[in-house]
Swiss-Prot record:
Residues 412-420 are annotated as: ATG17-binding. The gene is ATG13. It holds the Pfam family ATG13. Activates the ATG1 kinase in a nutritional condition dependent manner through the TOR pathway, leading to autophagy. Involved in ATG9 and ATG23 cycling through the pre-autophagosomal structure. Also involved in cytoplasm to vacuole transport (Cvt) and more specifically in Cvt vesicle formation. Seems to play a role in the switching machinery regulating the conversion between the Cvt pathway and autophagy. Finally, ATG13 is also required for glycogen storage during stationary phase. It comes from the Eukaryota. Belongs to the ATG13 family. Fungi subfamily. It is found in: Cytoplasm; Preautophagosomal structure. This is Autophagy-related protein 13. InterPro entries: ATG13, Atg13_N, HORMA_dom_sf. The keyword Nucleotide-binding does not apply. Residues 388-443, 568-611 are annotated as: Disordered. Residues 576-585 have a biased composition (Acidic residues). Gene3D superfamilies: 6.10.140.1900, HORMA domain.
């Protein structure tokens, strides 16, 4: 290995050490005039023209990155800058102001140990290496530049100057400046607030080749402000972060790179909620803040003031800020509002204070109420939690007669939280309130949920209260509009079922009363009536036989035609009983007469001619009378309407096809044209039905009378 290579390796090792020392000493606030145990570096404090102090602890931690020999690979060096929260108590809460000045609750004391502010990545990228040299003459100059230690040193000097400047411009430097100013006024801060500054800035070295965990702390990738939750910028970096890269320096063994990712919003502050009545030494400063706030509220005509026992807002007197003005520690006064998105109190339950008029301040923890944007809901809930009671401002009462109003009661579906704070302050201003119990505070899950609601800038709760009523009204109107249609349908069906009743009675041998129909559709019985079936069998058989004989003889002599007995389905009866085959279907059959020449076989019946002529006249009159009132299918001589039969009159087929059966059933008929369906069974059944006549007349004509209405 040549001397130039050894010098380059030494510069690379010093690069890692100097960068770590510079970043740590720029971020850590000096305590007592210097760092504990500081020692000068062996190579001096002015390496790369940047002054740094020696730190043996850091040098021991960074040893794996300062022992590069030119052969082994070096893992990336990660240096994190974080805000240490381990000094917070359980009654202290950390908040963050966004760019618009809205407070966002970060965590309560004891919940998280730290908040990561910056993450620096220092590495030697071995992907680019010029150890093999160059064979092209045009690249000799570039190759020599990479292998020149003096040139590399100059580039590193410029890099560290830029690095130091960058550390002074990052947002975390603002916190460091404020902490330094607050430590200079520690005595004054202790007198004013009764507590020391609990926040500190620290750094940590990590191995970049290992995963970085964020358990128990607020990691860099976690957005605190909800508006940054689901947005990404063009560089695929979370919108609450920004990234800066320093131009890499190429060497013979690789490229030296420095990259930083940091939070844009770092305006953190702490609210102490332990003893609100103890902080009374600086009441005049508080009143000045209230007066300035009153002026701000009065100048805005869109802001209304309202104070309610169930909705109280506090002006917290004890903000422990991370900033200060001048040489002293100035307390941060802020007005935060508490909203209740899940519960609305009664209109007349609270005291009314006129807008723009705040004339009395009763204690160091007064209550101001105003309309605020939805982005302050989360922080306002936490501010509400820290008060033992809220003062109802009343312009008509003097400050010494004012009393603390009843405390807020915050309840929601996410948990049971009851607050009891009804304190009368008429006895003494210096009276100490009891510390609040930790279990009376709202859970962080509820506050995190409220943060999710901040995606919408404006929440209008009025439409949501009207929507259910509109849905009910729309449903009722729609239901009422269906009633006339239902009545019309019922009337039309009733008329269609009863229009053919008189005509059917003229052509029927039934003596049953006129059937009546109801517009209400009754349920279809599941079983046939056994009593109706048994009582009607005897009379049905006798009546059908006599009627069949007379009609068959009269029509046979009159037309002289061969009648083809066919069975057509006019309607279909549907029942709901699937257990019995007897009540599955009830068909109404029609007749079709086919014209044609047939043999006249009535010559053997000369003795009945006179009687047949009378029957022919009666039959023709019945047919003419029936066809005058209703239209029938072109393919049928008669059409018998199903609607003319009542429930007890609908005939059903017997399983043996010997005797017709009638039973009571409710059915809805579907009317259509009759179709011709030949039925051989009825032809065969006609032999049994007409056994008393001659053999040559038995096969001529058969009236299917199963669709006629016969009474018991």
């Amino acid at each position: 290995m040549s001397d130039s290579d050894r010098e380059i390796i030494g510069l690379i090792n010093n690069f890692f050490l100097k960068a770590a020392l510079l970043l740590e000493q720029c971020k850590v606030v000096a305590r007592g005039g210097g760092f504990d145990g500081e020692e000068p570096l062996r190579d001096g404090n002015h390496l790369f023209n940047i002054e740094t102090r020696g730190d043996p602890t850091l040098e021991a931690q960074i040893q794996p990155w300062t022992t590069f020999d030119g052969e082994k690979s070096m893992p990336p060096l990660v240096l994190e800058t974080f805000l240490d929260l381990r000094g917070l108590h359980s009654n202290q809460t950390v908040y963050l102001h966004d760019s618009d000045g809205n407070p966002w609750m970060v965590c309560k004391g004891g919940k998280k140990s730290e908040i990561v502010l910056e993450r620096w990545l220092i590495e030697l990228d071995r992907q680019f290496s010029s150890t093999t040299g160059s064979t092209d003459a045009a690249e000799d100059d570039e190759y020599n530049e990479f292998n020149d230690p003096e040139n590399l040193h100059k580039q590193l000097v410029l890099l560290f100057r830029y690095l130091y400047t960058l550390t002074q411009l990052l947002p975390a430097n603002d916190i460091i400046t404020k902490l330094q100013a607050s430590q200079q006024g520690t005595a004054q801060a202790t007198t004013t607030t009764g507590t020391l500054k609990p926040l500190h800035i620290h750094t940590r070295l990590l191995d970049g080749s290992k995963p970085i965990l964020s358990k128990g702390r607020v990691g860099l990738s976690k957005p605190i402000i909800a508006s940054y939750s689901n947005t990404m910028n063009e560089t695929n970096i979370a919108s609450h972060l920004e990234q800066r890269k320093i131009t890499p320096i190429k060497t013979k063994f690789g490229s030296l790179r420095i990259t930083v990712s940091y939070r844009k919003d770092v305006d953190f502050y702490v609210i102490d909620q332990e003893d609100p009545y103890k902080r009374t030494t600086n009441v005049s400063a508080l009143q000045d803040t209230v007066t300035a706030t009153d002026r701000r509220i009065s100048s805005n005509s869109n802001i209304s003031i309202s104070v309610s026992p169930k909705t109280t807002n506090m002006l917290n007197a004890n903000h422990i800020p991370v900033d200060s003005s001048g040489g002293g520690f100035a307390r941060r006064q802020s007005i935060s509002s508490k909203l209740q998105p899940f519960k609305v109190g009664s209109v007349g339950s609270g005291s009314f204070v006129q807008s723009g008029s705040l004339q009395s301040v009763t204690n160091p923890n007064p209550s101001l109420s105003r309309n605020v944007s939805s982005s302050s809901v989360a922080a306002a809930l936490k501010v509400q939690r820290g008060s033992a009671g809220s003062t109802v401002l009343n312009s008509d009462l003097p400050p010494e007669l004012s009393s603390v109003g009843s405390g807020s009661k915050y309840s929601s579906s996410f948990g049971r939280i009851r607050r009891h704070s009804s304190v009368r302050r008429s006895e003494s201003i210096d009276r100490t309130a009891k510390p609040r119990k930790s279990n009376e505070t709202p859970p962080e899950d509820l506050l995190e949920f409220v943060k999710l609601l901040e995606d919408k800038k404006e929440l209008n709760m009025k439409p949501s209260t009207i929507l259910p009523q509109q849905d009910i009204s729309s449903s009722l109107i729609k239901f009422q509009s269906m009633k006339p249609n239902n009545d019309t349908l019922s009337d039309n069906l009733s008329m269609s079922m009863s229009i053919d009743q008189p005509n059917m009675r003229m052509g029927s041998n039934s003596h049953s009363p006129i059937p009546s129909f109801s517009p209400n559709y009754g349920s279809i019985p599941s079983r046939l009536s056994q009593g109706s079936r048994n009582n009607s069998n005897v009379e049905l058989i006798t009546s059908r036989k006599s009627s069949l004989d007379r009609h068959r003889l009269s029509l046979l002599n009159r037309t002289g035609s061969n009648v083809d007995i066919r069975r057509g389905s006019v309607g279909t009866m549907e029942t709901t009983n699937e257990d019995s085959k007897e009540d599955e279907d009830s068909h109404v059959h029609g007749l079709r007469f086919n014209s044609g020449t047939v043999n006249d076989k009535t010559e053997d019946n000369n003795e009945d001619d006179d009687e047949e002529e009378i029957l022919i006249k009666r039959s023709s009159n019945a047919v003419a009378s029936s066809t005058e009132h209703f239209s029938v299918s072109p393919r049928s001589a008669r059409s018998i309407s199903v609607s003319s039969y009542t429930r007890s009159q609908l005939p059903l087929k017997h399983p043996n096809f010997s005797y017709p059966t009638t039973s009571a059933t409710t059915a809805h008929a579907k009317f259509h044209k009759s179709e011709v369906i030949p039925d051989q069974l009825h032809r065969e059944g006609s032999h049994h039905h007409n056994s008393s006549h001659k053999n040559d007349e038995d096969d001529d004509l058969l009236f299917v009378m199963s669709d006629m209405n016969l009474t018991n």
